[in-house]
């Protein structure tokens, strides 16, 4: 049997040049969020299948990489009873389990930062992979809009360090639900309706209508709901909603959303707008939601929102929670397309030596430079020395020392 040299479909290898950019972005993320008081945590990539299939992950639950119970035959893999775990499809559900398990050892409220791989068994295409890195910040235990404001401020501070244009769109899941109830949908149908509405940007009003009709909903109700999104979009939830949905909305929902938008617009160097069509596909969102749009990438490059009911599914204690996820892979993709170069912070030196030369003195000198916080590479001279040095210069090795006959 011949071995296969290419990665599994939907997975990738990364060359040193791209890894340099990826590490640069991760370091920027860590340093920025640490300055806002977020604590780095880590959770396993494998989660209990019961957690992954708890109707919290929206469409992603259809994309779980399931893991068979040890020893079971591969041909029986489709039998769900034979799976007891799976690969995580995001970082939010694992964080909720983590907090429920460790709350007694954490500060309150707890500001979390987690960076790691997630897995979705979807059809690979440009910008979509089966394994990709997510970067999340979350605040657990903060019930006020201080959480949303802090998350948005920290994220805009991060994005402003990169050469990209972006807009942060903001809405509230409860406004979307109130509009659905006003149009005539039942409470128990709202999640199904919003899953279809979330595709409005991709398939348009006609596509959403066809999908909702296929789910068995009344055409008049569907059209009434869709017509609500044709109203003039004013950058104010209060002006947009008026008193139309008051019978279906909790107190202070619109007022709090107004305060989030006004505060962040005045404290962040970013374009922040109210967008009544913003949904976010995850059914676990319970309040304000936000998403980062960039004209340089089709689709969002990050998003998040409030999910106050998730942690209580693990422990019978109500715990408010809110998070923001940066689209790490998409951010890196934008930088690569711009031919972004990581700023050099250390001098790079290389010693090119003849073969069969004594190494002790040369390696000692290299270590002296490394102790001075310089990057030093020691290598033998190639037959094509000119080409060798050209490659080294491209890699940033500007200090090239050549040794001939131990000189």
Q: Predicted regions: what is each one?
A:
Residues 1-88, 93, 149, 153, ...:
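TRNA-binding/sensing appendages of the translation machinery
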Residues 21-36, 47-48, 79-82, 90-104, ...:
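Positively charged, Gly/Ser-enriched RNA/tRNA-binding surfaces
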């Amino acid at each position: 049997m011949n071995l296969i040299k290419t990665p599994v479909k939907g997975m990738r290898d990364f060359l040193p040049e791209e890894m340099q950019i990826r590490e640069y972005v991760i370091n920027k993320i860590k340093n920025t969020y640490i300055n806002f008081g977020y604590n780095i945590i880590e959770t396993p990539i494998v989660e209990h299948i019961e957690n992954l299939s708890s109707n919290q992950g929206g469409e992603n639950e259809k994309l779980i990489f399931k893991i068979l119970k040890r020893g079971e035959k591969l041909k029986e893999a489709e039998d769900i009873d034979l799976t007891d775990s799976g690969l995580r499809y995001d970082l939010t559900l694992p964080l909720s389990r983590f907090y429920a398990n460790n709350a007694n050892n954490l500060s309150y409220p707890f500001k979390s930062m987690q960076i790691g791989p997630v897995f979705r068994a979807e059809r690979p295409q440009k910008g979509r992979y089966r394994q990709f890195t997510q970067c999340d910040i979350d605040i657990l235990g903060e019930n006020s809009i201080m959480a949303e404001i802090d998350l948005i401020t920290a994220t805009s501070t991060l994005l402003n360090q990169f050469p990209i244009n972006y807009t942060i769109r903001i809405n509230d899941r409860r406004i979307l639900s109130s509009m659905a109830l006003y149009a005539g949908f039942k409470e128990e149908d709202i999640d199904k309706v919003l899953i279809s509405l979330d595709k409005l940007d991709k398939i348009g009003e006609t596509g959403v209508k066809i999908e909702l009709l296929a789910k068995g909903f009344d055409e008049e109700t569907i059209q009434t709901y869709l017509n609500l999104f044709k109203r003039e979009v004013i950058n104010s939830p209060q002006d947009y909603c008026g008193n139309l949905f008051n019978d279906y909305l909790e107190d202070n929902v619109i007022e709090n959303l107004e305060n989030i938008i006004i505060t962040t617009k005045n404290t962040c160097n970013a374009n922040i707008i109210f967008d009544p069509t913003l949904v976010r596909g995850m059914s676990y969102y319970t309040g304000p939601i936000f998403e980062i749009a960039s004209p340089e990438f089709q689709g969002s490059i990050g998003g998040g929102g409030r999910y106050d009911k998730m942690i209580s599914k693990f422990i019978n204690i109500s715990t408010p929670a809110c998070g923001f996820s940066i689209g790490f892979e998409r951010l890196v993709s934008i930088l690569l397309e711009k031919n972004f170069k990581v700023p050099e912070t250390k001098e790079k030196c290389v010693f090119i030596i003849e073969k069969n030369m004594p190494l002790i003195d040369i390696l000692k000198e290299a270590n002296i430079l490394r102790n001075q916080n310089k990057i030093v590479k020691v290598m033998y001279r190639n037959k094509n020395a000119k080409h060798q040095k050209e490659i080294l210069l491209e890699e940033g090795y500007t200090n090239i020392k050549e040794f001939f006959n131990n000189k």
